[in-house]
Each structure stands twice: as structure tokens, then as C-alpha cells.
Amino acid sequence: MSTKHSKAAAEFLKNKKQAAWHDETLWLVRAKRDRLSKEVPEWEELRNMACATKLYSNSHLDELLVEFENNARANGAHVYWAKDADEYCNIVYNILNQHGVKHFIKSKSMLAEECELNPFLESKGIEVVESDLGERILQLMHLKPSHIVLPAIHIKREQVGELFEREMGTEKGNFDPTYLTHAARKNLRQKFIHAEVAMTGANFAVASTGEIVVCTNEGNADMGTSQPKLQIAAFGMEKIVPDRESLGVFTRLLARSATGQPITTYTVSYTHLTLPTNSL
């Protein structure tokens, strides 16, 4: 069966050099993952514990989701439920509309991507700015992410340099990754400062405490939520874990499995709220 993804993949693979480079890059990440996992003697035990927790959570969603909602509300959050993409997009829009929001910054959210939140909000006159560097690159290129963790892994630095020259006025022909990263940081800082609302996804939602946990390497989620008075956290019900003990198992596995790191640079828990906040 032909799908949008398979058609896009077939088109991408026509460029043999790019396909080979992409394959090599992904295998480098996989090699890091394999190497780092072997540094943990109890790696397989942790995986089995995580699997058992997921099986438990998925078979007790009715209880865990209600527990999460009650605890999140007790923490001061507002909780909304959406049955499908249309309802989800409209809930977010209604929250933004109620607050008169026209500028909106977000970190990575698979739910928002799957539900096509960005084009929906843009059609309503709301500016959406992606703060994850890979997602921002793709947003400026009007492309979709190609990987759940490394969204712009198929884009070469020369392409990024040419893009930033057009969009941010960087030096022509300067493709140094550090230089380009600093240019993106400077450009995004103004977006952070003037954003009226920040959205994050969630790597985990803890039922027993009502907290959400967001893991990033760039700190963009933290930067986003530190400025605006309104924060929206959007995630699917599969993110639920029963308690902090379970959370500890997953945080030990997450970065090693995803990017071959011992831990993500930033692991932030949002529990008790100090500003007027909506949580979705």
C-alpha cells in the first residue's frame, strides 16, 4: 500500500549520495546506543521492568488517567481531554483565543505533529514558532520531520547554512555547526522573549503526582516555559506511568535508547504551578 511516507521515502532514496549519508548517520547513532547500553549491567533487567510497567499502564489506563487528572488539578493545572485530532486542535485554539494570543512558541510534541496543530493554528492567524533546532530548521524549510528523535537528520549542514543565510542573514558559505547553532539561538531568543504562550510535549506523565516530565538536550522547553504566563503541555495517554519509581526506570533507559547518551541534558518535572497555567 502506498502512503505519504512511502512516497516521500522513495523520492528521498533517488538521491543515492544523500541516502548513503543518511544511512551512515543513523547507524552512527545506533552504534552509540549499543555501546552505551552495554555500560549498564542491569540493562536487560531495566528493559523488562519498563516493558512490565507499560503493559500494566496500558491495561489500567482508566484508573491511571483519572488519578493523573485528579492530582494535576490539585497541583493547579487545568486538564482537557480530546477524542481526536480535530477536537485537540480546537481545544488548543480556544485556550489561545480566550487569552488573545497571537504568538506561540513550542518545543517538540509528537501529538501536535500527528494532529497537524501548526497549520491549523496558522490558518487562524496565530504565529507558531518551533524552538527545537531540528524542528525549527524543518519549519523554515516547510518540510516534515523524518525521525521521531532526530527530526532533521536527513538535512545536511550546507543546506542549513544556505537556509539561515536567507532567513537570518548569516555569513554566506559559513557552514560551521557551532556558528549556525549560535545564529539560531540568537534568532530564537527574541521569539522566546515575546512569546505569549509556550507549549511542550511530555516524555512522561506521572499518575501518582500529577506531574509531567520533559526531557531535552537544548533546554528549549525550559526557556519557553520560563517566560510566558501560560503553558500548555500536550501529550497522548501512552505517556502515563504509575509513579516516580516507574519514572526512574524509564529515565535511565530513555537517552541511551534514543541517542546513545547517559542522560538527556535537561530533565524537568512540572508539578506545583507558580503562574496561571493551562495544562492540556
Segments predicted by a language model, with ranges:
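Conserved alpha/beta enzyme-core scaffold
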Residues: 25, 87, 91, 99, ...
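Electropositive phosphate-/nucleotide-binding environments in soluble metabolic enzymes
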Residues: 55-62, 66, 82-86, 154, ...
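Glycine-rich anion/phosphate-binding loop at the beta-strand->alpha-helix junction
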Residues: 206-217, 221-222, 242, 246, ...
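Flexible, glycine/charged-enriched surface loops at secondary-structure junctions
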Residues: 78-82, 257-269
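Conserved small/polar residues in nucleotide/adenosyl-binding loops
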Residues: 271-277
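N-terminal leader/transition segments
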Residues: 1-124, 132
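Internal alpha/beta scaffold segment
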Residues: 228-261
